[in-house]
């Protein structure tokens, strides 16, 4: 049974927003720092991270149909800081894929007062906190 859970987790399709939900940035009340923390958390989990189009450039939107608005293609209208953050997350996931998907997960610190949580992944001599 426990082996089955590991296998299921390894093939999970992880997402934070979709065509059926409010966009991530909207759910975070346009708090980009919170959205980035959630994206980083998702990229540190087993399974496949899925990015809904526009999340990488800070597209917002309420429930359907506002979550399905057109992609913003004009670079000057995109959040380039968010895009660079996403590129760094993707690069980290590629570089440390084995650690992030096979490493031992340990919850280190939970601070409800400050809405803070910490975890680490360890594999052999590598550790990511």
Describe the role of every protein-language-model region.
Residues 24, 71-73, 99:
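Short clusters of hydrophobic/aromatic residues that line enzyme substrate/ligand-binding pockets
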Residues 19, 42, 54, 89, ...:
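Hydrophobic, well-ordered secondary-structure elements that form the walls
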Residues 108-129:
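Carbohydrate-binding surface patches
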Residues 1-49, 57, 111-113:
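Alpha-amylase-like alpha-glycosidases and glucanotransferases acting on alpha-linked glucans and related
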Residues 85-103:
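Amphipathic alpha-helical
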Residues 1-7, 31, 41, 60-88, ...:
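Active-site-proximal helices and loops of the catalytic beta/alpha 8
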Residues 48-51, 65:
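Short helix/strand-capping turn motifs
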Residues 18-22, 57-59, 78, 106, ...:
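Short, solvent-exposed loop/turn segments at secondary-structure junctions
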